[in-house]
């Protein structure tokens, strides 16, 4: 049976989200149709507002309403360390542990030759520019995920940053290989920051 066009379009829209396959998209589409009209309107407004009002910080690449973001503007934070993460959601995970009080830099991805992602496709050039322009930064903590791509990205950044005389460390791997920072519990992240290793 073929679905009416509005349902088919809704299913297709949900399938564009990462990790959402056909069955889940269909379930979400029918759930959306069954929702109260006001809730659907509010949901749609939230999507539009998020896309319209949020952008990336011109300094660190984090998601923000203001530019620069609240973290970059906060002079009480440790200005000598920059923690490099893959995605903005990793900043949120690190902030939850309340252990790290430095600055961040969001790469928006990792090096992945298989996926055709090279250094020019992620936020590395702006990190290097930031380090050149800010002599207060003494340490770069690399917090990419413990995946082959995350490790390759960490090594690449380390090779670029070390010649500038900036200390480069890597989060300790209380994080298991293949795990994502956003899914780690607070104690694991705390231990990973505490036990970071020099590269």
From Swiss-Prot:
Q: Which keywords accompany this UniProt record?
A: DNA damage, DNA recombination, DNA repair, Metal-binding, Zinc, Zinc-finger
Tell me where in this chain the Toprim domain is found. Answer: 80-176
Which InterPro entries is this protein grouped with?
A: DNA_Rcmb_RecR, Rcmb_RecR, Rcmb_RecR_Znf, TOPRIM_dom, TOPRIM_RecR
- Entries under SMART domains matching the protein: TOPRIM
Enumerate the Gene Ontology biological process terms: DNA recombination; DNA repair
Q: Give one Pfam family.
A: RecR_ZnF
Q: Where are the zinc fingers (C4-type)?
A: 57-72
Which GO terms fall under molecular function for this chain's record? DNA binding; zinc ion binding
> What role does it play?
May play a role in DNA repair. It seems to be involved in an RecBC-independent recombinational process of DNA repair. It may act with RecF and RecO.
**What PANTHER family is this protein classified in?**
RECOMBINATION PROTEIN RECR
Name of the protein in its database record: Recombination protein RecR
**Record organism:** Lactiplantibacillus plantarum (strain ATCC BAA-793 / NCIMB 8826 / WCFS1) (Lactobacillus plantarum)
Gene label: recR
């Amino acid at each position: 049976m073929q679905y009416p066009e509005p349902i088919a379009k809704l299913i297709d829209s949900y399938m564009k989200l990462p990790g959402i396959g056909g069955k889940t998209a269909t379930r979400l589409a029918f759930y959306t149709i069954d929702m109260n009209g006001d809730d659907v309107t509010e949901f749609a407004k939230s999507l539009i507002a998020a896309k319209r009002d949020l952008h990336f910080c011109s300094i660190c690449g984090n998601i923000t309403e203001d530019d620069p973001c609240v973290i970059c503007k906060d002079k009480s934070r440790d200005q000598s360390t920059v923690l490099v993460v893959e995605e903005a959601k990793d900043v949120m995970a690190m902030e939850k542990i309340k252990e790290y009080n430095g600055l961040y830099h969001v790469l928006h991805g990792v090096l992945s030759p298989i996926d055709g992602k090279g250094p020019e496709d992620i936020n590395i050039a702006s990190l290097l520019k930031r380090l050149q322009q800010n002599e207060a930064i003494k340490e770069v903590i690399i917090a990419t995920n413990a995946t082959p791509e995350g490790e390759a990205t960490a090594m690449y950044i380390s090779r670029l940053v070390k010649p500038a005389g900036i200390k480069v460390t890597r989060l300790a791997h209380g994080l298991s290989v293949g795990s994502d920072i956003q899914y780690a519990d607070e104690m694991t992240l705390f231990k990973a920051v505490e036990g970071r290793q020099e590269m």
